[in-house]
UniProtKB/Swiss-Prot annotation:
It catalyses: a myo-inositol phosphate + H2O = myo-inositol + phosphate. Belongs to the inositol monophosphatase superfamily. Signal peptide: none annotated. This is Inositol-1-monophosphatase. It comes from Mesorhizobium japonicum (strain LMG 29417 / CECT 9101 / MAFF 303099). Its EC number is 3.1.3.25.
């Protein structure tokens, strides 16, 4: 696949941060058996990866703004462009030595996501996409799964973090979805959940209580792989309200209907 200069900048930043995370991940696995524990070390790894990405992207496009997990919003001279960055999505997995975590970088232009990169350094899987240019994993073209019956599907989900979201609502949603699908999976990284839907590994995904940096790149990846995404109300305000329902056209619609059942019944 031919990448634009801008996407190459994003890939280089993600892979450089990924190499740093890979080194730190090896150390985290060693710290699992120590008395000190790996918690503080993981926080440092997260910040270090964000510093790398911030430096790389700022050097390549000095005027662009940022929305980042650690730094928050950073205004740029160019108000039309903004990087949306999660340097380590799947922190709890990383903390526990589980190799399901990712770097996620998206570029927003005039309010629209136009490019995205998701990189899982533990598995060396690089997902890339540009608006109108398709979706790829390690240069292989991606397409969402073609199953059209919920009963045949494997669906990904996330659950509310402690202190965020409503666990009771989630359990009712989960019960309704489990009654209609072949299986439910929780990876612990929304960025990878969306990437797996784009790659056809999972048929759909839903979650609430997310931040824009968790999902910005993945939303475009799914669209460019032929999939459909909406928020829990069926609209397109995913980055603002933090809810996502994704799949191919048929499954996304059926999954949205399934997860909405308890909301209308309460």
């Amino acid at each position: 696949m031919a990448r634009s200069a801008l996407l190459n900048v994003m890939v280089q930043a993600a892979m450089k941060a990924g190499r740093s995370l890979s080194r730190d991940f090896g150390e985290v696995q060693n710290l699992q058996v120590s008395l000190k524990g790996p918690g503080d070390y993981v926080s440092q790894a997260d910040r270090k990866a964000e510093d790398i990405i911030f430096a790389e992207l700022s050097k390549a496009r000095p005027g662009y703004g940022f929305l980042m997990e650690e730094r928050g919003a950073v205004e740029g001279e160019d108000s039309q462009h903004r990087w949306i960055v999660d340097p380590l999505d799947g922190t709890t997995n990383f903390l526990h030595g589980i190799p399901l975590f990712a770097v996620s970088i998206a570029l927003e232009r005039q309010g629209q996501i136009v490019a995205g990169v998701i990189y899982n350094p533990a598995m060396d899987e690089l997902y890339t996409t540009e608006r109108g240019g398709g979706a790829f994993m390690n240069d292989r073209r991606l397409r969402v799964a073609g199953r059209i019956k919920l009963v045949d599907t494997v669906i990904g989900c996330g659950m509310p973090h402690l202190g965020r979201g409503h666990h009771g609502n989630f359990l009712v949603e989960l019960r309704n979805v489990m009654a209609e699908v072949s299986g439910v999976r929780r990876l612990g990284s929304a960025a990878l959940d969306l990437a797996y839907v784009a790659a056809g590994r999972m048929d759909g995904f839903w979650e609430t209580g997310l931040s824009a940096w968790d999902i910005a790149a993945g939303l475009l990846l799914i669209r460019e792989a032929g999939g459909f995404v909406s928020d829990m109300d069926g609209g397109q305000d995913m980055l603002d309200n933090g809810s996502v329902v994704a799949g191919n056209e048929v499954i996304q619609r059926a999954l949205l209907k399934a997860v909405k059942k308890p909301l209308s019944a309460r």
